Amino acid sequence: MTVNDATRKLVRQRANFLCEYCHSLEEASAAKFAIDHILPQSLGGSDNPDNLALACQRCNGYRYNFTTGIDPQTQEVIPLFHPRKQKWSDHFIWSTDGLRIIGVTPTGQATCNRLDVNDERHNEGSIVKARRLWLQGGWHPPEEDPRQQT
Ligand SMILES: [Zn+2]
């Protein structure tokens, strides 16, 4: 029931040391990232690498045992973004200033909402403040991520 060290290493490297939900960089964060079970163990999810993702403490905490979120535009219940089966850039973009994640599909929007990826409901936007510093440091956002066009 515990993920072994070799698997942890694989998950970290595969994720390029980024949270697979909010693309925070582990090195720039105070807390070590968690190995997230995409289908939670409480719902029968396995320790197979196909069911694992690297997640920062905030995303891991907000995701908890949830596998769905609400699309704020339609109020529909939508499965959360699945880092193994879906591609981040198909569902999310960065705002022009690189500080906020914008969901561009129902999956993206439901995930942004559930994980509060821009700290709009919690922490007084502290993740946005951290991103501003990372941006100044040249670590953020990841180069391959799309940004909103003006
Ligand atoms: Zn995260």
Predicted ranges, named:
Residues 1-6, 10, 25-28, 50, ...:
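Extended charged
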Residues 38, 43, 72-74:
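Short edge-strand/loop segments of extracellular domains
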Residues 17-18, 28:
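Active-site-adjacent scaffolding segments
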